[in-house]
Amino acid sequence: MSEQKVALVTGALGGIGSEICRQLVTAGYKIIATVVPREEDREKQWLQSEGFQDSDVRFVLTDLNNHEAATAAIQEAIAAEGRVDVLVNNAGITRDATFKKMSYEQWSQVIDTNLKTLFTVTQPVFNKMLEQKSGRIVNISSVNGLKGQFGQANYSASKAGIIGFTKALAQEGARSNICVNVVAPGYTATPMVTAMREDVIKSIEAQIPLQRLAAPAEIAAAVMYLVSEHGAYVTGETLSINGGLYMH
């Protein structure tokens, strides 16, 4: 087994995912990044923009809505690296609509991507961690999974489900030194958010006691705390990083 620690990250190429990968690589981790579809140009551009070497990241083609194929791909990647120390379930989508107007497709797309795929990704990783008798899993939820959000019944349900899943899995993993936690970000200055109109951003910031969006680095730092030696006595918890938008 390699001495280098390995982290599997879903949604690795997104705004928050990229920063999580950056901080993990800086801490000495090898990254297994799930992607669909494989796009060599995009992957190379991402590696260059993040300052990564090819050896820092193993890209794995995983259509997370194809359970058998995705499971096999993840198992193959873990076998190739010989270990997996950290899992960050970060992939997620939105399909916003009021519940009255929400289609079954909009509901299913979000539940399947944000919640159902947790089983597909986590089970092969969790089983390897049980074998190793160690591991850290961090699931990325959302402030809206805690408080709910108008027009996001599907998204809020999926992100709340992540929290319940985490609490249950934390109890199963504890005896094998596997810590399972949630990071629940508030509004974060990812490219998708900062591309919104300035007046929309200002209206969001006005609702936040700290009067600003989170930086992706602040979300990633919370993840890094939970996977570090300093987070070794934390499990089944939800770490809210929302600037005071929701206090509970």
Curated annotation (Swiss-Prot):
One of its GO terms (cellular component) is cytoplasm. CDD domains: BKR_SDR_c. It is found in: Cytoplasm. Transmembrane segments: none annotated. PANTHER family: 3-OXOACYL-(ACYL-CARRIER-PROTEIN) REDUCTASE (PTHR42879), 3-OXOACYL-[ACYL-CARRIER-PROTEIN] REDUCTASE FABG (PTHR42879:SF2). It catalyses: a (3R)-3-hydroxyacyl-CoA + NADP(+) = a 3-oxoacyl-CoA + NADPH + H(+). This is Acetoacetyl-CoA reductase. Keywords: Cytoplasm, NADP, Oxidoreductase. Its EC number is 1.1.1.36. Substrate binds at residues 96, 149-152, 186-187, 197. The active site is at residue 155. GO terms for molecular function: acetoacetyl-CoA reductase activity. NADP(+) binds at residues 14-16, 42, 90-94, 185-188. The keyword NADP applies. Its main location: cytoplasm. GO terms for biological process: lipid metabolic process; monocarboxylic acid metabolic process; poly-hydroxybutyrate biosynthetic process. It is an enzyme of class 1 (oxidoreductase). Pathway: Biopolymer metabolism; poly-(R)-3-hydroxybutanoate biosynthesis. Belongs to the short-chain dehydrogenases/reductases (SDR) family.
